[in-house]
Amino acid sequence: MKAVIHPGLLHGTVERVICSKSAGHRALICAAMAEGETLLEGLDWCEDLTATRKGLEAMGACFRPEGEAWRVIPGRTAGKVFLDCGESGSTLRFLLPLTAALGQEAELTGRGKLASRPLFPLDEQMMEHGAWLSERGVFPLRVSGRLRAGKYTLAGNVSSQFISGLLMALPLAEGDSRIAITGELQSGPYVDMTLGMMARFGVDVRREEGCFLIRGGRGYASPGQLRVEGDWSGAAFWLAAGALSPEGLRVRGLDLSSAQGDRRMLALLRAFGAETMAAGEEVVVRARPMHGVEIDAGDIPDLVPVLAVVAAAARGETRIRRIARLRLKESDRVASVLALLSALGVSARAGEDEMVIEGRGGFTGGEVDSFRDHRIAMAAAVAACAAEGPVVIREAQAVSKSYPGFFEQFRLLGGRVKEED
């Protein structure tokens, strides 16, 4: 699908931002593993969360709609299970150690770039602790055996999803475990979200310098009812659009004290020069003259595409550091961002771990490729609002991975978008 967007700044109110995909994955898994039923409120079914739900259903859990909420009824399937992870890295990296901790033979598959996304050293650590895995890098990926408690070692600068996956799996193992983190932990807020969700289901992990201590054989306990918080990652696109609009944008349904690392979007927009206001669960952003800044993206990799758009709409040079891991996302996001900016008349360059953007105060029109990457497609849509001519986004359906209603909300805010097959 192509999306053709004509220039026009957005304005108005996002009455309810989509639920946090990161929190949703964790809530679904903890609820499915818990003793007792859980009523989950505030869920929105994007492709990635649907993949996790269907995987847990294959493993024996039942998900029943109740009005706008979902009741999760834990259960176990005997015998081998087949799990389709779609294009969701979280689904793959969370369910893989989970099946092994349960001693459940499984065959995992997926599509797109998922097979080529890294599993090392998670796979190595699992095999050193009782699990057997088939050849990595190709689907189907088969796992059998049972994950043992013990000492695990993971690098902090590869993927926080490896850490989160083991954290959620190891309470189900017999015996206590330790996860030692070597080097600096990047994307630490995602690990904090995991620990926070586990605590709400009665599993407390002790954190010491450079390691996590997990009590085994205790399991999860349902809190009865839980609301999944709003998504700062998804809201970031509307906040960025507000920073381009003199009328501004209002976004509701955000937790200002959230553990989500992408909550930094608000502070970064202030640093660029935009006007921001926040109270309760409501945030307002308006355009003001913006200038280049320096950004450390180590903990906020998902914000880089939309921050690059804001940087291009500002005046002057912006440097975004610690971006190397972006090459291993749904697309090579370093190359994808550079291609997006270039197609819209913006000069930018990147080294191994840094991107430099020469802000020109706006964009030309043009045709851009989403590279089937949801965050590239949504960033391009924000850029189109401040472009000099129409912007065509190829494979714009990629937004469904995390935000199926993105273009519908875009129209409600005054955006002029036409979707073409």
Give the positions of each predicted feature.
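Structural preference for solvent-exposed beta-strand-turn elements
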Residues: 1-421
